[in-house]
């Protein structure tokens, strides 16, 4: 038996708010691919998916504690007489920690000040929550994923520039950024 523990309300990570025009996975639009994969997972008999669940502790010999939020996200009326949370005590043969983090922060003095954010976080704020993270944005990058954020900011009418430490990039995302008038500064 397998447990898939996810702290969000649904599976998918950043694929949930990706721009389907720019991303395909196995020749499918990313949202179609994601829905297909989630349906495949839900149909597996030996798999239990725990959404809204946080792994709280990882002890010796693969003993884990997880807290599942069952009704905390519901209104008081909806959750009356319902269990709020469940504590899972898990003894696993094997554990795979797949945190999903691919972006690394820049290390510099005062990088924890307001307005200094990871590009993927900015993209989630603007595309998923509809929240602007400033009117003038500079994105510093060493790969093409930051161009997704730049394009999202640009589509919302925000001023954005990209500083790319590489000499150039011929990716579709970088080309699209140039075509949309986003200033790119190369190394």
Where are the model-predicted features located?
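Residues forming the flavin
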Residues: 1-187
């Amino acid at each position: 038996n397998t447990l898939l523990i996810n702290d969000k309300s649904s599976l998918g990570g950043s694929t949930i708010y990706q721009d389907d025009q720019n991303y395909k996975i196995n020749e499918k639009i990313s949202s179609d691919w994601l829905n297909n994969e989630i349906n495949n997972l839900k149909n597996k008999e030996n798999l239990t998916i725990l959404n809204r669940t946080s792994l709280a502790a990882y002890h010796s010999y693969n003993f884990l504690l997880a807290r599942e939020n069952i009704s905390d996200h519901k209104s008081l009326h909806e959750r009356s007489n319902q269990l709020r949370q469940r504590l899972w005590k898990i003894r696993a043969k094997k554990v795979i920690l797949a945190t999903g983090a691919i972006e690394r922060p820049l290390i510099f003095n005062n990088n924890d000040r307001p307005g200094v954010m990871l590009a993927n976080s900015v993209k989630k704020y603007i595309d998923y929550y509809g929240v602007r993270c400033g009117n003038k944005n500079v994105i510093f990058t060493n790969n093409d994923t930051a161009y997704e954020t730049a394009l999202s900011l640009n589509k919302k009418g925000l001023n954005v520039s990209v500083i790319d430490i590489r000499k150039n990039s011929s990716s579709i995302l970088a080309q699209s950024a140039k075509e949309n008038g986003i200033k790119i500064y190369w190394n």
